[in-house]
């Protein structure tokens, strides 16, 4: 879990070792995935296994390579001191199959929404980061019907990432694409072929509720509102942003 208010982490092992990823925010993967590094935005979670049987007697450091300007010491996260002998035999293994995972078919989407991450200023001239240029207390505009599938295109107009978090529902990342003004129609809706997206990174392929929206890119996600109706929220998970109007109501209607 990245519990930082704003800092992202780009994590790897100092010896070049492998992480065996077994899950994302909202569940296990179908099969384990071997990764050498991963990025965690605020509120993102990842489930990992490290096989230390290969590193007998070694000292290994978990390193942070995030390009964000670090405070002193934030590049060194944790040190593992691997012993030479086990007190008891370890017979544990990572299963080849973890949990059946039924992907959401974007072709079944009842609606596509283009949602812009942008900024304005308040009446004192202070910067406000907003979702679709709307304040928190304005009426809900994201109102999916219960048991429907939707695709959301999150358009990040900033020069830095925003971690976008949806309550209630899990989603899958379809992919990302650098956008230009020509990619939008006269109403600001994104128009393109889903096949033109760059696929999500290996550690993002699972059921999620937080996504890193890259600067200058559209990030497309698909979700199925199939279990609950009512009032929820979606927001940027940078604490200073979500507490200053980068949050919107999400109403699932019966």
Model-identified regions with their sequence ranges:
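Histidine- and aromatic-rich segments of cupredoxin/plastocyanin-like copper-binding domains
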Residues: 1-100, 105
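Active-site pocket scaffolds in enzymes
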Residues: 20-36, 108-254
